[in-house]
Structures are given as structure tokens and as C-alpha cells.
């Protein structure tokens, strides 16, 4: 990859995730610390745009679910236009998402995917179940274990929690908690489904990205890797969580290049907020629930190999609040690309914001 193409890719990413131009599209339930909406994506299906995400209220999984409500509701919005306005049309509570006699104590990220027969909705929840016996002493009172479920329907408005089933779960101690699914088709011909997911070890010491694959004709996912992209060595040493895979338009300088995808990810120096030395370089460092953003690039014919672009420093930081900028997701249309993400505000809430980059602007960025 030439330096020129690398620079244009970075310019493209910054133009898409423009922190100053971002507009709020979904507000959290309160404009206060610990409240946000997001962690989902947008699809276009049957002539309508559909947006999924979860409302999160104050609480801390590191100290137990008794610390607050936390992941409260999975909501689905619709709009006839990619620019909104968005109307809430469907909602799932914790009790709605319970199955196999396991109580849901918190709702985390979700992901829509269009398939040949309709729509899939992947949902991550924390269920009230115990750690494996040999590490039970590490489990805090009131906490559970995360895994990922799936609901399938011909249309979005027909999604029903009564058909919910498990998608992936593991007893691997280093990746015991699985959440924040990112579903995508492995090819334009839909030869199978890829599922990135975030994992935490039983110690909650780090956040990692795993990859599961379900080939065409298969009914179940197989976990291919718990380390689809390695954690970084500086600003993202504690957390590297992929939140989106974006196939980059092949225009201008990219017309003669092999097809590429951009991978947005969340990163952090530590899962807890670090006490900064008074003489240190003051900066947002990222921590659990307040991550900041980076990106990587991968050639599609070499999937899942990913080249990290944000090696030494983060690329996406909110100019407000804690600097948190996370859960980036994108949707490509004929007119351009819409990006959404959670952005920290002055009141430390995290509404879902968006920015649209026109295809005309994208063509200008990659012009020869």
C-alpha cells in the first residue's frame, strides 16, 4: 500500500467520523453520566431504514449489577429517510429476552443482518449464571456471564423474542464473556456470515475481538479466533474491540486496487480510569464504557488479516466530556455513507450521533 493511498484512507475515515459535524439522532434516557444509546447498526430493508441499539442507564458491571440498571432496553427505530427522523417501533426488555430458564440482567450491543430469507438480529445479554467452578471466586456478587443470541424473521417488524436462540457461548476462561456482535456477509454472494464479537476474560482485565463463522448451508457458528485483531501496544493496550466492517468504495485511486474493507474499533489504555500524573501529557486515555476510536484496513482476499492504522495514537476522540467516541457503525447507500457512533457530551452522557459523507465527497477524497 502506497503512502498516498494510506493518507487518503485516513482522510476518508476522518471525514466520515467528523466529530464537529456529528448530529444527535437518538438521545439517552437522561442527559447524565452513565446514560447512553447505541451499540447497534442501521440496515435498509423493504424500502425502510431500520436502526437497532440499546438504552443503557447508570451502573457498573465491574462492581456488580446492584450498582444500577445498566443495559435496560433493546430498541428498534425506523425511518423512510437515512437522515431521519427516527421513530421507535419495537422494544425488547430484559424479561423479553430470557430463554432456557436464564434470567437476563443486562442488555449489551446488537446487530442487524439481511439474509436471503429476511432479517437476523443478534443480541448480546448478560445472563444470571455462574462462572466455571474452578474460577467461581472471581465472580462478583450479582453479576452473570455474557453471550450472544439470535432472532430471525422475514421482516424487521416481525422479529419476535419467542423465537430467540443462542448464537455463540464459550467456557474458555480467557474469553468467558462474549458481547457486542458485529454481523456481516462474508461476500456479496452471501456465501456465509461473519460475526465479530467482543470478549472479556473471567478477570475482566481486557477487551478483545473474536471472530465466528457460519458458512452457507451451516446452522451453527464456529468460533474461528478469540484474537481476530491483537490489542495494541500504546493507547489501545487494554481494549481493541471491532465495531464495524466497511467495504470501501472503489473510486479514484482505489479503482486499480484490490477490494479493501475498513475496520473501526474501540480502544483503551485500561479498563479502569487511570489516575493521571500531574506532569503527564493530558489526553483522553479511554477506559471501560468510555473508549476512544481507531481503525485498520484489510484486503478482502486476505480476510481476516487486518493492518492497524492507529498504531500509536487514537484517531477518533469526542471534543466534549471524557473524549469517548465508540461503537462506530456505517451503512452504504447510492448517495453516500452514513456513520453513527456514541459520542461523549459535556454532561457526560453518550447520545447516538451521525454524519453523512456524500459519494461526491468520497470521490473527491480518492481522486487521482
Give the positions of each predicted feature.
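Beta-rich carbohydrate-recognition and catalytic domains
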Residues: 1-39, 43-105, 113-180, 184-321, ...
Amino acid at each position: 500500500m502506497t503512502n498516498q493511498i494510506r493518507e487518503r484512507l485516513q482522510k476518508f475515515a476522518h471525514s466520515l467520523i467528523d466529530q464537529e459535524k456529528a448530529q444527535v439522532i437518538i438521545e439517552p434516557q437522561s442527559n447524565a453520566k452513565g446514560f447512553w444509546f447505541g451499540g447497534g447498526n442501521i440496515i435498509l430493508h423493504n424500502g425502510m431504514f431500520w436502526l437497532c441499539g440499546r438504552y443503557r442507564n447508570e451502573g457498573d458491571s465491574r462492581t456488580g449489577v446492584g450498582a444500577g440498571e445498566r443495559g435496560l432496553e433493546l430498541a428498534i427505530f425506523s425511518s423512510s429517510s437515512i437522515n431521519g427522523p427516527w421513530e421507535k417501533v419495537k422494544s425488547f426488555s430484559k424479561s423479553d429476552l430470557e430463554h432456557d430458564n436464564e434470567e437476563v440482567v443486562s442488555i449489551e450491543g446488537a446487530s442487524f443482518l439481511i439474509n436471503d430469507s429476511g432479517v437476523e438480529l443478534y443480541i448480546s445479554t448478560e445472563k444470571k449464571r455462574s462462572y466455571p467452578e474452578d474460577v467461581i471466586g472471581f465472580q462478583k456478587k450479582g453479576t452473570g456471564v455474557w453471550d450472544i443470541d439470535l432472532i430471525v424473521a422475514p421482516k424487521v417488524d416481525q422479529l419476535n423474542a419467542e423465537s430467540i436462540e443462542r448464537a455463540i457461548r464459550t467456557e474458555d476462561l480467557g474469553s468467558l464473556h462474549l458481547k457486542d456482535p458485529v454481523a456481516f456477509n462474508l461476500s456479496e454472494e452471501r456465501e456465509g456470515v461473519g460475526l465479530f464479537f467482543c470478549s472479556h476474560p473471567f478477570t475482566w482485565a481486557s477487551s478483545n475481538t473474536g471472530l465466528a463463522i457460519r458458512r452457507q448451508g451451516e446452522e451453527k457458528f464456529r468460533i474461528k479466533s478469540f484474537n481476530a485483531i491483537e490489542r495494541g501496544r500504546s493507547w489501545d493496550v487494554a481494549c481493541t474491540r471491532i465495531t464495524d466492517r466497511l467495504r470501501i468504495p472503489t473510486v479514484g485511486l482505489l479503482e486499480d486496487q484490490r477490494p479493501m474493507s475498513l475496520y473501526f474499533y474501540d480502544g483503551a489504555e485500561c479498563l479502569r480510569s487511570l489516575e493521571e500524573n500531574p506532569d503527564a501529557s493530558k489526553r483522553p486515555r479511554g477506559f471501560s464504557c468510555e473508549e476512544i476510536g481507531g481503525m485498520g484496513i484489510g484486503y478482502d482476499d486476505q480476510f481476516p488479516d487486518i493492518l492497524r492504522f492507529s498504531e500509536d495514537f487514537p484517531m477518533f476522540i469526542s471534543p466534549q466530556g471524557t473524549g469517548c467516541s465508540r461503537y462506530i457503525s456505517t451503512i452504504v447507500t447510492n448517495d453516500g455513507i452514513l456513520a453513527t457512533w456514541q459520542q461523549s457530551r459535556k454532561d457526560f452522557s453518550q447520545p447516538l450521533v451521525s454524519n453523512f459523507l456524500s459519494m461526491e465527497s468520497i470521490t473527491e477524497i480518492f481522486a487521482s
